[in-house]
Amino acid sequence: MSALKKSFIKRKLAKKQKQNRPMPQWVRMKTGNTMKYNAKRRHWRRTKLKL
């Protein structure tokens, strides 16, 4: 990807970067360990974003 990005693409990338993180530990404690991991986790090489 080029260094010069359009602002809407940059915003989308920033949102996806924030979404791509593990589940906080306090959520696991709150739900009684029923939610163990973030199912929507994305690896940069395996799954590409459709931008």
UniProtKB/Swiss-Prot annotation:
Compositional bias segments (type: Basic residues): 7-19
Q: Name one GO biological process term.
A: translation
What molecular function terms (GO) are annotated for this protein? structural constituent of ribosome
Among Pfam families, the record links this protein to: Ribosomal_L39
List keywords of the entry alphabetically. Ribonucleoprotein, Ribosomal protein
**According to the UniProt record, where is the region Disordered?**
1-23
The GO cellular component terms are: cytosolic large ribosomal subunit
Its assembly, as annotated, is: Interacts with impact.
Family annotation (PANTHER family): LARGE RIBOSOMAL SUBUNIT PROTEIN EL39 (PTHR19970:SF0), RIBOSOMAL PROTEIN L39E (PTHR19970)
Q: Which family does it belong to?
A: Belongs to the eukaryotic ribosomal protein eL39 family.
User: What is the protein name given in its UniProt record?
Assistant: Large ribosomal subunit protein eL39
Write down the species: Caenorhabditis elegans
Lineage here is: Eukaryota, Metazoa, Ecdysozoa, Nematoda, Chromadorea
